């Protein structure tokens, strides 16, 4: 009787172990937090050198999740990548637009966002970033350089009119200054893409926040940041569940 009971326990343990290991391909292992690419529309499956990365994306050329062609498209006013038009409320100021290009380069090219990658139920991507700790100076400069440009929405992630094939302001949405829609730097950096970023209290060079801008000749400072947060997660942080947006 005891032998039969022990055999039953072993069988149940084997079944539970098998079920736990049979995860879908899109699932990201808890330890898979460093040097990884998102499972998204234009990302490579693995980071690798890209010597021909264009313009503002060039800091990632030593190790990138984006291709050279993707980096070129990111610099266009309306690229074929997402058919997204920065100039939906008139011409965006160049000093403002450079921040959006840099934001796009970070999103598409960085292999150091693993600790903040989450699974999503979306047709065009299986993963997104959530609450990436953006260095406070990068956010403040972004807001300062864009406060006099114009937009019609405080969340650019959803709610656009796509009937023409590119994003247009939804009915009733008025074009006004960024400062009207984003009264603070945090309102811009955190609200713009549904909390992809969270403004950090840490400064650039601290090793505790992600830098949108960096000099690649001095190395990529975001590698150290990713390692710090990955170690914290592996030490016992919350689970990485599936979210809807």
From Swiss-Prot:
One GO biological process term is: sperm-egg recognition
Positions glycosylated per UniProt: 121, 161, 201
Found in which tissues?
Spleen, thymus, bone marrow, ovarian carcinoma, and uterine carcinoma.
InterPro entries assigned to the protein according to its UniProt record, in alphabetical order: Folate_rcpt (IPR004269), Folate_rcpt-like (IPR018143)
PANTHER family under this entry?
FOLATE RECEPTOR (PTHR10517), FOLATE RECEPTOR GAMMA (PTHR10517:SF17)
- Keyword Cytoplasm assigned to the entry: answer is no
Compartments (UniProt record): Secreted
What is the name of this protein?
Folate receptor gamma
Kindly give the Pfam families that the UniProt entry links to this protein. Answer: Folate_rec
Tell me which family the UniProt entry assigns to this protein. Answer: Belongs to the folate receptor family.
Cysteine pairings via disulfide bonds: 37-65, 57-105, 66-109, 89-175, 96-146, 135-209, 139-189, 152-169
One term under GO cellular component: membrane
Give a yes or no for keyword Signal in this entry: yes
Task: Name the job this protein performs.
Answer: Binds to folate and reduced folic acid derivatives and mediates delivery of 5-methyltetrahydrofolate to the interior of cells. Isoform Short does not bind folate.
Record-level Gene Ontology MF annotations: folic acid binding; signaling receptor activity
- Where folate binds, per the record, is at 103, 107, 124-128, 157-162, 196
Keywords in alphabetical order: Disulfide bond, Folate-binding, Glycoprotein, Receptor, Secreted, Signal
Q: Which residues form the signal peptide?
A: 1-22
What is the native source organism of this protein?
Answer: Homo sapiens
């Amino acid at each position: 009787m005891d032998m039969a009971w022990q055999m039953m326990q072993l069988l149940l343990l084997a079944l539970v172990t098998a079920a736990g290991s049979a995860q879908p391909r899109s699932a990201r292992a808890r330890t898979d937090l460093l040097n990884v690419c998102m499972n998204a529309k234009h990302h490579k499956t693995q980071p690798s050198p890209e010597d021909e990365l264009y313009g503002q994306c060039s800091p990632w050329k030593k190790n990138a999740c984006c291709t050279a062609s993707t980096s070129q498209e990111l610099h266009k006013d309306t690229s074929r990548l997402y058919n997204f038009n920065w100039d939906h409320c008139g011409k965006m100021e160049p000093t403002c637009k450079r921040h959006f290009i840099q934001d796009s380069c970070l999103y598409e090219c960085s292999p150091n966002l693993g600790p903040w990658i989450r699974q999503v139920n979306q047709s065009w991507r299986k993963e997104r970033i959530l609450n990436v700790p953006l260095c406070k100076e990068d956010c403040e400069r972004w807001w300062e350089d864009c406060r006099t440009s114009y937009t019609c929405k405080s969340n650019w992630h959803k709610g656009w009119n796509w009937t023409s094939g590119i994003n247009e302001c939804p009915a009733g949405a008025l074009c006004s200054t960024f400062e009207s829609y984003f009264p603070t730097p945090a309102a811009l950096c955190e609200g713009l893409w549904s909390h992809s970023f969270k403004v950090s209290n840490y400064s650039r060079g601290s090793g505790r926040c992600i830098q949108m801008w960096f000099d690649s000749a001095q190395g990529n400072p975001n590698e150290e940041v990713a390692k710090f947060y990955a170690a914290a997660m592996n030490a016992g942080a919350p689970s990485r569940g599936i979210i809807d947006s």
